[in-house]
């Protein structure tokens, strides 16, 4: 649509300077907006020069040189307000596709560079390391490599030493047997309860473990008493008590005469 130019022209208006840009008329501004909208809706990459302008619609002052930098590359109008800021729909789609391809390629590169992905692609199995310290219940590893097993006696509220083993599995099975002896089938085991069904019944096993614990406690108490009596005061009274105790112990074993003579000969 072409609007007639009703603006009055002043004859005595001064000529614009060399560095002053050309001013667009309202008709030119409207044509620029319409062409830009048509360019966006149609989706064309390149737009032909606008044909709606006549030679008399463009006002060019006399002696004003043309500058190529002021001419729009889309609508070919000098002093355009922004045709270059509009993108065609197909250009936007291509730009989005390029961004998606870049993101996908970067993620694929990171995935291929990781050693876990390489191992999975090669058919290898990814194994998780098992914590050796907490591998079995009631088992601890000594600094020199062997494995020690112990269990807590629920009746006496004490720890029962089960021994030292070459492998962690042997120590774990020793713990399981002791746990079955204390708690029966309700015990928390390292291995299934079916593996121990052919073992000794639970009351007998519990009595054996309790007997071992009491025997070790009595031996340690006897050793401590003997050490106190031997290092006590060095008097005749302490020596006689110690000799009498040793004779009574030997008498219980059935060799009272020989042991008594031997002890008497030692202190004569």
UniProtKB/Swiss-Prot annotation:
Residues 97-139 are annotated as: Disordered. This is Ethylene-responsive transcription factor ERF109. Pfam families: AP2. It is found in: Nucleus. It comes from the Eukaryota. The gene is ERF109. Interacts with MED25. GO terms for molecular function: DNA-binding transcription factor activity; transcription cis-regulatory region binding. It comes from Arabidopsis thaliana (Mouse-ear cress). Residues 135-192 bind DNA. The lineage of its organism: Eukaryota, Viridiplantae, Streptophyta, Embryophyta, Tracheophyta. Residues 125-135 have a biased composition (Basic residues). Belongs to the AP2/ERF transcription factor family. ERF subfamily.
């Amino acid at each position: 649509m072409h609007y007639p130019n009703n603006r009055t022209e002043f004859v005595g208006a001064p000529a614009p300077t060399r560095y002053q840009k050309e001013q667009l008329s309202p008709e030119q501004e409207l044509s620029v907006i319409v062409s830009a909208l048509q360019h966006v809706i149609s989706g064309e990459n390149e737009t032909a020069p606008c044909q709606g302008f006549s030679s008399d619609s463009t006002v060019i002052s006399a002696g004003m040189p043309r500058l190529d930098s002021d001419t729009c590359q889309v609508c070919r109008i000098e002093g355009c307000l922004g045709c270059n800021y509009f993108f065609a729909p197909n250009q936007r789609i291509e730009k989005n596709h390029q961004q998606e391809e870049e993101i996908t390629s970067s993620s694929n590169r990171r995935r291929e560079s990781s050693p876990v992905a390489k191992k999975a692609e090669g058919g290898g199995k990814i194994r998780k390391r098992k914590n050796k310290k907490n591998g079995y219940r009631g088992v601890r590893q000594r600094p020199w490599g062997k494995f020690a097993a112990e269990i807590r006696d629920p009746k006496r509220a004490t720890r029962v030493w089960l021994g030292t083993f070459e492998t962690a599995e042997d120590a774990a099975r020793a713990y399981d047997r002791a746990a079955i002896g204390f708690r029966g089938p309700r015990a928390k085991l390292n291995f299934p309860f079916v593996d121990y069904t052919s073992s000794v019944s639970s009351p007998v096993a519990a009595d054996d473990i309790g007997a071992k614990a009491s025997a070790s406690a009595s031996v340690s108490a006897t050793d401590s008493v003997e050490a106190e009596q031997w290092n006590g005061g060095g008097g005749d009274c302490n020596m006689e008590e110690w000799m009498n105790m040793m004779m009574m112990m030997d008498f219980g074993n059935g060799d009272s005469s020989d042991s008594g003579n031997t002890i008497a000969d030692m202190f004569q």
